[in-house]
Amino acid sequence: MPLIRIRGLHRVFGEGAARAHVLRGIDLDIHAGEFVAIVGTSGSGKSTLMNILGLLDRPSAGSYHLAGKDVARLSRDARAGLRNRLFGFVFQQYNLIPTLTALENVELPASHAGAAREARRARAAALLRSLGLGHRLTARPLQMSGGQQQRVSIARALMNGGAVILADEPTGALDAESGRQVMRLLSDLAGRGHTVILITHDTDIAARAGRVIRVGEGRIAGDSGTRAAGPAVPVLPETTGSRSAFLHALREAARSALAAIGASPVRTALTLSGIVIGVASVVAMLAIGRGAQEEFVKRASAIGTNWVVVGSDQDTRMPRRPLTLDDAMALKGLPNVAGVMPGRWEQATVRAGAFSIDTDIIGTDRDFRGVHGWDVVRGSFFSEADERGGSPVLLLGSTVAGTLFPDGRDPTGEFVFVNMSPFLVGGVLESKGLSENGSDRDKVVAMPLRSLESRVYGPGELSVIVVALQDMARLDESNALLREAMIRRHGTEDFWLADAAGAFAAAEADRASQNLLLGAVATISIFVGGIGVMNIMFITVRERTREIGIRSATGAAMRDILVQFLTEATVLSALGGLAGLALAVGIGAVAALGLGMPVVFSVTVALGALAGATAMGAAFGLVPAIRAARLSPVEALASP
């Protein structure tokens, strides 16, 4: 039984007036191990016949049996599998991928077959050495002569066994000596059992074959007849798809993608700018925002979080009663109240010797310590007797103490002047750092309320009443009781209530709004970057159309081409995402070390931004990848 049997083969291109009937009723048998030359002038149909024989194209009509199997109507991927296992192509223009080395070009068929990298690399190197190219393994096509490139092409054709070698004008682009070397190689392969089908217009070249078939006007014009052939080369066994094979293909696609991306670094960088900026902005800004939020919570928590502030409404259009010490005493008896601190805030100049400072003065009582958790680190708190008698005693905040006593000595027992009134320093308050709005909490002086009223400013209304709660889970209940108690005392709601939980909630709402805005900006930027990826992938497909044809000819299925270019888009986007993360870390470092801003990165946000950028790139790379996968192998090989 012949290896190749063709009956009534026709190939028609175009429709209507553009219709071209290239092959007309071809009948042909070729046995395994034959060396056949198909010779004809330009336009005779010989190249179209070769494309159909090599399963690069399908006939319009007729039958084609290969090793007893009808292959005329096979799917594209099924034909690719047969090409990979059975055929090896040697082209006039060599058709080597310029970005790959000689070794990598030869490996292509085995790579598409799913062969292990080490095994295929060893076989490719052995083939190149057998063809006298052992010293050119790492050379790229443009670094080699035409004869060397054609020998690389022959080695590639033999990579998976090359049971059938299809050579299309293999000497057409070579000098005479290189052409003779190539023909000797093909004759040697035929002698070793390979079925060699040579396509040529040169009758002298054709005469080197054991059988000459002449083609003219799409028909067989002459056939010297079948010659006896030796034992045929076995065909590479068919492999079935598996998860490991798919992962192998994915790894190879990723490796090829990195090589392709590295070939145009400037274009790659420009393409990725949108993704880089989008990822960097969202990760860095959210890190800065989260750092600011945590710093806010830390600062606010320094004076406790279990309090409610009662303040007087300052709307002068409405009648109101001032907050008084009696109001504070009345609130102490309410359920869930742990302490009540009356507070009157004023401004004063405090002096000690040659040093002075303008600072806040708080008139309060001993509940100041319990409500805000604000104790002394030196000396002692003022006593109940100090409160009742309005004693000239006060406590210095650490900033005030450091300003008035810069030599670092303990100011306890020293005298200072508040405006013009002398006071004894009873102690120094522990440091509470900055407030949530950035002011210095330690720039403060605390004294008994009666001392403030009798010795510095005279009688006046309270600024606020701060109520500490025992259980913050009952906050709503306590707020309602405080409101009722104050309305009973004042006859109207001429006051306001504020609590730490509300302040935290407002800050969190602001942060959420900022995050939403940042997310929107980053999404738009990444979206624009995705469009850039799509654009560059369309350009890449157009620039590498011949490469797609070469990969198809060496056995790449549509899925392989799709995975190749989709992986390239995905890797491209992932690199942009990683670059964005690196830029975000740089921005965060500048903010933290250079500007002193709190920065807290989130692994979840970073991974989410990276995944989003990668997914966006993959989505935008899908259409170009599909276009690449659907390219006709014949048309792709014919591209410039």
UniProtKB/Swiss-Prot annotation:
The chain crosses the membrane at residues 269-289, 519-539, 560-580, 581-601, 606-626. It is a multi-pass membrane protein. One of its GO terms (biological process) is response to antibiotic. GO terms for cellular component: plasma membrane. Gene3D superfamilies: P-loop containing nucleotide triphosphate hydrolases. It is found in: Cell inner membrane. InterPro entries: AAA+_ATPase (IPR003593), ABC3_permease_C (IPR003838), ABC_transporter-like_ATP-bd (IPR003439), ABC_transporter-like_CS (IPR017871), ABC_transpr_LolD-like (IPR015854), MacB-like_ATP-bd (IPR017911), MacB_PCD (IPR025857), P-loop_NTPase (IPR027417). Residues 4-242 form the ABC transporter domain. Keywords: Antibiotic resistance, ATP-binding, Cell inner membrane, Cell membrane, Membrane, Nucleotide-binding, Plasmid, Translocase, Transmembrane, Transmembrane helix, Transport. GO terms for molecular function: ATP binding; ATP hydrolysis activity; transmembrane transporter activity. ATP binds at G40, T41, S42, G43, S44, G45, K46, S47. It is an enzyme of class 7 (translocase). Belongs to the ABC transporter superfamily. Macrolide exporter (TC 3.A.1.122) family. Non-canonical ABC transporter that contains transmembrane domains (TMD), which form a pore in the inner membrane, and an ATP-binding domain (NBD), which is responsible for energy generation. Confers resistance against macrolides. Homodimer. This is Macrolide export ATP-binding/permease protein MacB 3. The lineage of its organism: Bacteria, Pseudomonadati, Pseudomonadota, Alphaproteobacteria, Rhodobacterales.
